[in-house]
Amino acid sequence: MEEGSRSQSPREELELSMLDGPQEELTPLNNDLRIQPNSAEDPSPAQVGKESPWSPCNKSVVGKCKLWMVIVTIFLCFIIVIVISLCLVGVTYIDEDENEILELSSNKTFFITLKIPEECANEEGLHHLLTERLTDTYRQSPSLSRFFTSADILDFSVENATVTYHLQFGVPSEDDDFMKYMMSEELVLGIMRQSFHDKNISTCESLGLDPESLLLYE
């Protein structure tokens, strides 16, 4: 009984007073304390700092049209315009040299002699094939087609196995530069040699392949 009625120590009284203090201090004012939930749409400061550098391109310009769509469309239109311009330039380009009208008031004559290989010397109709080849070669030549007139047989010798042709071209009068560059023996003979190298005559495949078998003179 003495122990139960013993008065409490000062320390115990202090602890009890702290526990039994006014509860008003623990209650929020006006009971307005609310927990604000984090919205998924509101980016956190860390997310804002890590925003993609391409995010401005995803902004809407008109309706659902994004900025990147506008940029890509402009770029494609620019490429299409360039391609169309290049096509039009290629179609409408006019070569002034091809359309230049020259007054071909003079004639230029060459004689070309072809040595026929022995295995083809007795081939019938060979001279006709050669005439067609010479005519087609110069008529289809980009350099001399405008000036070529004719190719005629001048001599056909079975004994010597040679055939000589008379080549005639129309040329401008008194044009030294034209005669020097466009009607040179090297050019006329070179076109013929190239023709034999590109395509042989079926009945005489070795004809014209030997450089010594072609002779051109005026």
From Swiss-Prot:
<dbReference type="InterPro" id="IPR033223">
    <property type="entry name" value="TTMP"/>
</dbReference>
<keyword id="KW-0472">Membrane</keyword>
<keyword id="KW-1133">Transmembrane helix</keyword>
<feature type="region of interest" description="Disordered">
    <location>
        <begin position="1"/>
        <end position="54"/>
    </location>
</feature>
<keyword id="KW-0256">Endoplasmic reticulum</keyword>
<dbReference type="GO" id="GO:0005789">
    <property type="term" value="C:endoplasmic reticulum membrane"/>
</dbReference>
<protein>
    <recommendedName>
        <fullName>TPA-induced transmembrane protein homolog</fullName>
    </recommendedName>
</protein>
<feature type="transmembrane region" description="Helical">
    <location>
        <begin position="66"/>
        <end position="86"/>
    </location>
</feature>
<keyword id="KW-0812">Transmembrane</keyword>
